[in-house]
């Protein structure tokens, strides 16, 4: 589980292009942004996301409540989170069917969802202009997430780390 900023001042990414030439890229000078909170289940290849205007403990509470409703009855979900302030806040309300796991600091490679953000930016959120302000940013984030979920097996291929099944079975 993690969140990614999506906005008009997007990231530049690498693209394949004709040897010896440089592609022209668009770069927007707007400042509107939103935050895509997302969690994935590598085993089932499913995900849940929520687009929110800010990152805070209140926003995290909203996402955890939404995720808790999406977890099948009788199932418990373990979430790998980084050490962001809103992930470790004492005011955070964690539903009973969720457990938060915090890996060591500065280890994003241990969080499967980090590769999802990279994929979304590479495929749908970079090299484009989001005209229309905040609504366009929210629409782009939702469209990118829905396009990802529409690709059969993509979430599983992005997030199924070889060490993950053994780590889950021993805990």
Task: Give the residues covered by each predicted segment.
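Extended, low-complexity cationic-aromatic segments
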Residues: 1-65, 166-171
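Acidic, metal-coordinating catalytic cores used for nucleic-acid/nucleotide bond scission
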Residues: 5-7, 55-56, 77-90, 105-110
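RNase H-like two-metal-ion nuclease catalytic core shared by retroviral integrases
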Residues: 81-83, 101-123, 137
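Short amphipathic alpha-helical segments
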Residues: 12-13, 91-93
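RNase H-like polynucleotidyl transferase catalytic core
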Residues: 22-30, 96-115, 129
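C-terminal anion-handling pockets and recognition modules
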Residues: 114-171
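Short, well-ordered coil/turn elements that cap or connect secondary structure elements
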Residues: 74, 93-98
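Short, basic/hydrophobic alpha-helical segments
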Residues: 58-78
């Amino acid at each position: 589980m993690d969140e990614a900023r999506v906005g008009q001042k997007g990231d530049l990414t690498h693209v394949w292009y004709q040897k010896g030439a440089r592609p022209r890229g668009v770069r927007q000078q707007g400042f509107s942004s939103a935050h895509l909170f997302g969690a994935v289940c590598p085993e089932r290849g499913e995900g849940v996301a929520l687009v929110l205007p800010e990152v805070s403990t209140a926003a995290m509470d909203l996402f955890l409540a939404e995720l808790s409703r999406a977890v099948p009855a009788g199932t418990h979900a373990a979430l790998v989170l980084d050490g962001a302030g809103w992930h470790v806040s004492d005011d955070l309300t964690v539903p009973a069917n969720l457990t938060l796991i915090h890996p060591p600091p500065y280890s994003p490679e241990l969080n499967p969802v980090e590769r999802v953000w990279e994929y979304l930016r590479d495929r749908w959120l970079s090299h484009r202009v989001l005209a229309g302000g905040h609504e366009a940013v929210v629409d782009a984030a939702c469209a990118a997430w829905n396009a990802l979920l529409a690709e059969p097996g993509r979430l599983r291929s992005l997030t199924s780390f070889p060490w993950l099944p053994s780590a889950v079975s021993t805990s």
